[in-house]
Amino acid sequence: MMRLIRTLPLRCFKTRIRRQGSLLCLRCFSSYSKPLLQKSMSLKNIQLSDLSSSPLSKNKEKQEKPEKENEGKHSIGLLDRFSEDFITQGNGLKPTTSQNQLDTIKFYQMLRERGNFSDEQCKIIIALLLQLLNDQFYSCYNDLFLRDMELNKQSHLFSSLETELKFAIQNSRDTQLNEHHLQLLKLKRELNSIHDELNEIIIDLLQKDAKLEFNNQKLENTLLYRQLNLKLNDCSNKIQTKILGDIRSHIENLRWQTTRSGLLVILVLVCSIMIGVSASKKERPGLQEPEEPEILAPKEDIDTTFPQDQHDID
């Protein structure tokens, strides 16, 4: 059906313009359709990948181009991926045709005034132009440009949403970091308080242990002091007894020596007295009788005094 629709206007056009000359008709047709055909040909030369790629993925595609050329694979466009519902249901422009974009009355008047065409010929030429534009330009325009614009809008929306998401994620991260930081500060404070409490408990225990050790050491010192006092008392008693014993022995020795010396002195005196008495008797023989009792008296005194001195020495 599409082939019949495309060929019917050409056949009708050939049959109806034979009388007025084909060259003039072709010149007018080429003058009006040449710029439009150039636009349509330029659209065909554009690759689908360049139109379908979003601005965010252009750098990646530039890097992947040499690899694709080496492999001999062509880039896949969006026509194979998305359907026409992407355009019709999107927020972008709607697909259009040449009937909606061209001013057919203006072209009709130009053909009537400058080309000297009849009414039917003008209608056929305009229908042919509209069909060619739809086939060569607006089909590609609807398939490529509108989708590209929609993709650009979607990419822009995606980028804006991405920035919003990044901002929200960053804010959430910042809030979470702040919360974690506050929790860490709280934990540090609690840890410091627990550490202080533990230090206080340890200090109390150490003080108690120190007091117990001090008391035990004090008791041990008192016991040692008592033992030392007892030992000192024993030693002092022993020393006193030894000293007293030595002193007594010395005193007794001195007594015996004094008694001996006293006895010797008394004996010497007695002997000297006896010698003196005997000598006096020899000198005075006549005086011996009255003097004998006088001489005997001191002997008795000496005998009586000797035991008194001995008692004093004892």
From Swiss-Prot:
It holds the Pfam family CCDC90-like. It is found in: Mitochondrion membrane. Residues 1-29 form a transit peptide. Its main location: mitochondrion. This is Uncharacterized protein YLR283W, mitochondrial. Residues 58-74 have a biased composition (Basic and acidic residues). It comes from Saccharomyces cerevisiae (strain ATCC 204508 / S288c). Keywords: Coiled coil, Membrane, Mitochondrion, Transit peptide, Transmembrane, Transmembrane helix. GO terms for biological process: regulation of proline metabolic process. GO terms for cellular component: endoplasmic reticulum; mitochondrial inner membrane; mitochondrion. Residues 177-207 form a coiled coil. It comes from the Eukaryota. The chain crosses the membrane at residues 262-279. It is a single-pass membrane protein. PANTHER family: MOZ PROTEIN REPRESENTS A CHROMATIN-ASSOCIATED ACETYLTRANSFERASE, PROTEIN FMP32, MITOCHONDRIAL. Residues 52-74, 281-314 are annotated as: Disordered.
